[in-house]
Regions:
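Glycine-rich, acidic/polar active-site loops that bind/position phosphate-bearing ligands
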Residues: 1-139, 144-171
Length: 171
């Protein structure tokens, strides 16, 4: 904070006394049917496939990313929202991602240390809620060859105690 305040002074801001970081992690994940998952020892033991054929269909965006969320996954997402709300973690968006069976959850940003703790809770809750729906949530960064993996985009900001976001684009 001290060095950030020094930079603020160089730009003529004499009011700022403290700068804090905040982050909004976007958690990507794959959802698979539990019965299918249980047939794959590689998925069970490593969280990813170690052998197998390439998928018959790629990740054409028009039919997955922009497609409707499947009812079973939608029900999972609704239940997940409820469980996260109970913990005080509201989600801003949930949607399909580029690869088949891939999705994303983006909680509301928070101060960095709190957002990090919340993301650990989010990942645990995602797995537990999936099991209740007969699904398995895969958080491995690359569980399937030949399609996009799951990343975690982190949207950062530096905010002054006067409420100014230092990373907001200027005019």
């Amino acid at each position: 904070s001290r060095q950030a305040v020094r930079i603020c002074r160089l730009f003529g801001d004499n009011l700022t006394q403290r700068v804090t970081t905040s982050v909004g992690p976007e958690q990507e994940y794959f959802i698979v049917d539990r019965e299918t998952y249980l047939k794959r020892k590689d998925l069970i033991f490593t969280g990813r496939t170690l052998f197998g054929a390439m998928p018959p269909k790629g990740q054409e965006m028009e039919d997955h990313y922009f497609g409707a969320i499947k009812e079973r996954v939608s029900n999972y997402m609704k239940d997940l929202d409820i469980e996260l709300w109970k913990l005080g973690i509201p989600a801003k968006t949930e949607h399909n991602e580029a690869a088949p069976a891939q999705h994303e959850l983006a909680p509301i940003y928070n101060t960095t240390n709190v957002a990090t703790d919340e993301n650990m809770l989010v990942m645990n809750v995602m797995k537990k809620v999936a099991l209740r729906h007969g699904l398995v949530c895969l958080l491995h960064e690359k569980p399937f060859a030949g399609v996009n993996g799951s990343g975690k985009h982190n949207n950062w900001s530096l905010t002054t105690d006067t409420g100014h976001n230092l990373l907001e684009p200027g005019r």
